[in-house]
Amino acid sequence: MFRQSLRSIARTRTGTIGVRTYAEAVNPDVLKVSLVAPHQAIFTNKEVSQVNLPASSGEMGVLANHVPTVEELAPGVVEVIESSGTASKYFVSGGFASILPGSKLSISTVEAHPLDAFSSENIKSLLAEAQKNASSADETVAAEAAIEIEVLEALQAAVH
Amino acid sequence: ATLREIETRLKSIKNIEKITNTMKVVASTRMGRAQRAMASSRAFREGDSDFFATAETSTPETAEKTLIIAVSSDKGLCGSIHSQIAKATRAKLQETPNADVVTIGDKIKAQMLRTHSSNVVLSFNGVGKEAPTFWEASLIADEIRKLGDYDKIEVMYNKFVSGVAFEPSVFPSFSPISIEESPKLSEFELEEDQAIPTSLSQISLTNAILNAMAEGYASEISARRNAMDNASKNAGEMINKYSILYNRTRQAVITNELVDIITGASSLD
């Protein structure tokens, strides 16, 4: 008898706990961003107000409650604007941004570095070399150079 | 055994102890870096595993072509790391006898060739000396992609559980078709012209390989540290045993000589 009533209490308890879901536990009005490269996680679930992304279909700004989607990123600048208004800029070499339900944005990219870590002279000399290689007879070298030019030109535009 | 024999034995055990101890120290110093690499690759993988979890992507139950990628490394002396992966891969092959196998690392290659030589289609070596990089993982993924399309790809690796434990686990890698067929994909607004499923499937394979290699590396280093720690302890025990035996034998030899001398001297009286 006692055991039976215990069991029924246990059942009702689990019932009420089961209603509480993960999506309710987080505040959906704050955008949470993770910016990760394979060798380093720059942000993990950091609460920010806006993120600007260099999507391959064009620049896009992401705010909280954005519709879930997946975007391929072109080489360009990811701008993270914190709720205090300070913005930090990172250059990424392309990758993916997935916006998940619950205002969660995760950006995975192969390389990501702060914009002020780049030297404009280095970019110029590397770009000159890549442009020289782009007209190479070897198809692989030419294709690699074309990618290099795409990244370096985006980087040059971002640094200036 | 004679005194000389025990002496050489004792010396060689002492040398072995020095070697295992050094290997243990080397493994300990690498441990920190291996764990950092593993943590960042885990975080990197979360990006797309979150997406797959939300879209509820799953591998097809009945796959015509299955590929198993077994990730381990080239170096031994690290406990049961390689044989555990081989065992797990063999168990998978029991379920799907026609699956193709790609091996990463010489040790797992040797083990798979012994029992399932006809299934192994491609193997890599020279990885796992240092913490894996994205560059290595993408080169491997590129080669694997040249094998053709598979309905189901599974990456077998040693999951790093703690400093003393690891367990063979599986990362699924999804084909573009299974991504498109995900039941909850409609929650996302994907642009049709960008071929997102194809690129996502490619990056998720690279990601799975990178994460598997990083976890495997960390597990291997910690397993090696433990194996070498045990070996050093055992060597220490043997050194103690043999030192006692050596001293006893030396005593016995001296006593024997004394007995000889004294009996000789007393016989002269």
UniProtKB/Swiss-Prot annotation, chain A:
Pfam families: ATP-synt_DE_N (PF02823), ATPD_C_fung (PF21334). GO terms for molecular function: proton-transporting ATP synthase activity, rotational mechanism. The keyword Ion transport applies. It is a peripheral membrane protein. It is found in: Mitochondrion inner membrane. HAMAP family: ATP_synth_epsil_bac (MF_00530). Belongs to the ATPase epsilon chain family. F-type ATP synthases have 2 components, the catalytic core F(1) and the membrane-embedded component F(0), linked together by a central stalk and a peripheral stalk. The central stalk, also called rotor shaft, is often seen as part of F(1). The peripheral stalk is seen as part of F(0). F(0) contains the membrane channel next to the rotor. F-type ATP synthases form dimers but each monomer functions independently in ATP generation. This is ATP synthase subunit delta, mitochondrial. It comes from Pichia angusta.
Curated annotation (Swiss-Prot), chain B:
The keyword Transport applies. GO terms for molecular function: proton-transporting ATP synthase activity, rotational mechanism. Pfam families: ATP-synt (PF00231). Keywords: ATP synthesis, CF(1), Hydrogen ion transport, Ion transport, Membrane, Mitochondrion, Mitochondrion inner membrane, Transport. It is found in: Mitochondrion inner membrane. InterPro entries: ATP_synth_F1_ATPase_gsu, ATP_synth_F1_gsu, ATP_synth_F1_gsu_CS. PANTHER family: ATP SYNTHASE GAMMA CHAIN (PTHR11693), ATP SYNTHASE SUBUNIT GAMMA, MITOCHONDRIAL (PTHR11693:SF22). Belongs to the ATPase gamma chain family. This is ATP synthase subunit gamma, mitochondrial. It comes from Pichia angusta. The lineage of its organism: Eukaryota, Fungi, Dikarya, Ascomycota, Saccharomycotina.
